[in-house]
């Protein structure tokens, strides 16, 4: 992992030259990977199902597909603003000594009227002195 912002910026610059992917997209992807690492270390790793563009990028490679958010479905847990807030605070509080800190900015309903509760969580990632905004849509799985 990186020990300072200069190392991270250098890695992103080199990766951008190699892949042709815009540096901001690479930075966003890096931040989402750091968040996903925390999810995988949390007690909720079996309840949060990754889907969408970030899952595809993980399967086929970032050079084939980039995404600006992490789309998930929740199974086996109550899905309401308060519970989602508690879960996300717990997840982003996991320290894995990677130089990344997360702050929950807000939690909003994605749809006014929907069969299931669904939320968009805006998260600010702090990498040394670099700030990156993220969106983390959460939905309840059908039948749970």
Label the model's feature ranges.
Residues 1-144:
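Compositionally biased terminal segments of proteins
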């Amino acid at each position: 992992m990186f020990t300072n912002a200069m190392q991270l910026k250098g890695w992103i610059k080199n990766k951008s030259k190699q892949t042709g992917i815009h540096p901001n997209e690479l930075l966003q992807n890096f931040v989402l990977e750091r968040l996903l690492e925390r999810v995988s270390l949390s007690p909720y790793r079996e309840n949060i199902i990754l889907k969408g563009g970030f899952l595809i990028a993980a399967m086929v490679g970032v050079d084939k597909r980039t995404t600006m958010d992490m789309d998930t479905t929740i199974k086996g847990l109550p899905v309401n603003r308060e519970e989602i807030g508690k879960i996300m605070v717990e997840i982003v509080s996991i320290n894995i000594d990677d130089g990344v800190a997360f702050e929950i900015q807000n939690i909003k309903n994605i749809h006014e009227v929907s069969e299931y509760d669904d939320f968009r969580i805006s998260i600010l990632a702090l990498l040394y002195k670099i700030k990156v905004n993220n969106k983390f849509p959460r939905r309840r799985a059908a039948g749970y």
